[in-house]
Amino acid sequence: MGIPELLSSVVCPGGQGDVSIVDNLLIMSVEQTRSRIDCGLQGVSKEASPDRFRGIRIFDISNLSQPKQVGAVQTCRGSHTHSVVAGPDQDGKIIVYNSGTQGVRDEEEMEECIGNIPGDNRTALFRIDVIEIPLSLIHI
């Protein structure tokens, strides 16, 4: 038996960090508002920004010494935790349930994100996201 060792590390701020592995893909929860889609270290302004990332990141880990981000799915409240519930199926899709606990993004940043409007059933406050990851669109 060998001694466990660190093979590689990826710097990609965003907090939370729950992970799941499906074949050669690593799916990672990202919740904090400072994270960027490009994994940059400079953070994001407090205003609505196309650079901000909150949701799940998808990494190709077929080469463990060089993991690389190959996909990302934005969500209204980020991803505090997720569960892979199916896949890949015969159509080459992975299904992930996602739950975020951060505040709802501004609609300026993500149009379908509706916050606390009394009586509005479309609110993102209490929802669970169902995310479909088609492997044919992931470039690995």
Regions found by a protein language model. Give the residues of each.
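Feature marking well-ordered beta-strand scaffolds used for ligand recognition
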Residues: M1-I138
